[in-house]
Amino acid sequence: MKRQSALVVFSGGQDSTTCLFWAMKHYEYVETVTFSYGQRHSQELEVAKEIAAEQGVKHHILDMSLLGQITENALTSDIAIETKDGEVPNTFVDGRNHLFLSFAAVLAKQRKIRDIVTGVCQTDFSGYPDCRDVFVKSLNVTLNLAMDYEFVIQTPLMWLDKAETWELADQLGKFDYVRQKTLTCYNGIRGTGCRQCPACHLRQAGLEKYLSQKGKN
């Protein structure tokens, strides 16, 4: 039986688009919310808008540009992407998932929606502390207390690696759509991306692993 309604935190990338299709399978009614936070690859706003329109779901865009005023990172500033052993990559935006989920919860309550779907993933979390299961569960409790509302934060990708996320898209019948239409690349290139940035490397490695495993079955 499908649950009633859900709000998907949506960027138009591989993970959130897979979550959108997951939500459309499991819920009667789905809305999406995208955040404009001064990201360098602003194309993601247009991609998210386009995908939401194609799938016939209501799409909200919230202005979170203040993030760019108080943080310095490779996603909102014109600095080179760096990954150092033992350190959080400089693509990490302090407070992003915390703020996004909190504002998504405010919107969800106004829309009379209890379930919030997010594509955060601990398996491939790249050292990002706000992608951990313990963080999401803690925030879920905090939001319920803060707004006296029974939210449920759904994380369908939490324990999946990138190959398994591709598998889920395939199981949902959306493999080609996700492969061709989504934008994961830090340099704003849709589909296969630039093949150079960390996001593209992770996406491509997962794709190759899944296709290899699928070929053996």
Curated annotation (Swiss-Prot):
Source organism of this protein record: Streptococcus mutans serotype c (strain ATCC 700610 / UA159)
Instruction: Please describe the quaternary structure of this protein.
Output: Homodimer.
The protein's name in its UniProt record: 7-cyano-7-deazaguanine synthase
- Necessary cofactors: Zn(2+)
The record, for Pfam families, names: QueC
Q: Please explain the role this protein plays, according to its UniProt record.
A: Catalyzes the ATP-dependent conversion of 7-carboxy-7-deazaguanine (CDG) to 7-cyano-7-deazaguanine (preQ(0)).
> What taxonomic classification does the UniProt entry list for its organism?
Bacteria, Bacillati, Bacillota, Bacilli, Lactobacillales
Question: Annotated pathway, please?
Answer: Purine metabolism; 7-cyano-7-deazaguanine biosynthesis
Major enzyme class: ligase
Q: What is the gene called?
A: queC
GO terms under biological process: queuosine biosynthetic process
Q: What EC designation does it have?
A: 6.3.4.20
* Protein family membership: Belongs to the QueC family.
The UniProt annotation places Zn(2+) binding at C185, C194, C197, C200
Q: How is the cofactor bound?
A: Binds 1 zinc ion per subunit.
Q: Its domain of life?
A: Bacteria
Name the keywords, alphabetized. Answer: ATP-binding, Ligase, Metal-binding, Nucleotide-binding, Queuosine biosynthesis, Zinc
